Amino acid sequence: NTCEDIVDIKKEVDLPVIGIIKSVYDDSDVYITPTMKEIDALAATGVEIIALNATDRPRPNGLDLDTLFKEARAKYPNQLFMADCSCYEDCKHAAEIGFDLVGTTLCGYTAKTKGTAIPNYDLLSRITTELNVPVIAEGGVWERGQLQKVFSYPVHAAVIGTAITRPRDITRRFVEAIS
């Protein structure tokens, strides 16, 4: 979540890295790489993919996604950009404006998608068949069977996050299973 983390990871891992910066602004619920300030900082790290919130929610300072992405693409024409989306409409719009990849990252985390079961297999099915852009399945993959089902769709890759990176959440799931 920081540029320092990205630089350190890139020293140790010979794989493409998806970079984000989480920044909170008073006038917006969008916090994943919400402005050019964060995009500039990420680009300076040499990260392979910059992910940013691509939902239709208002961005900081009243900026809209289309304007931000147009500026980012013009400034960094060779940079790969991933759209962190919550629903089909977000994914479709992101593909239309030129994002290189779309991810299901924010499904279940916006007012529009709150309560949606994740991984959202219906969303994966629809975007992998209807959109002509690589899809990154992200969100809610905790079990091997879920990952196998995710890969039954023609996704480009899957991100396993909390299931392996947050010991407190991992422990809570085990405790809940025996309570």
Where are these regions (language model features)?
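Catalytic cores of alpha/beta
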Residues: 27-41, 86-98, 131-137, 141-158
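Non-cysteine beta-strand/loop elements that form the S-adenosyl-L-methionine
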Residues: 18-20, 100-107
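Conserved beta-strand positions in the central sheet of alpha/beta enzyme cores
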Residues: 50-52, 82, 103, 159
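Active-site-adjacent beta->alpha loops and helix N-cap segments on the catalytic face
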Residues: 1-18, 29-36, 54-74, 88-93, ...
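Short beta-strand/loop segments at the ligand-binding rim of alpha/beta enzyme cores
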Residues: 13-27, 73-83, 128-138
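Extended substrate/RNA-proximal surfaces in nucleic-acid metabolism proteins
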Residues: 39-43, 47, 52-53
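Short, electropositive alpha-helical surface patch
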Residues: 69, 76-77, 151-162
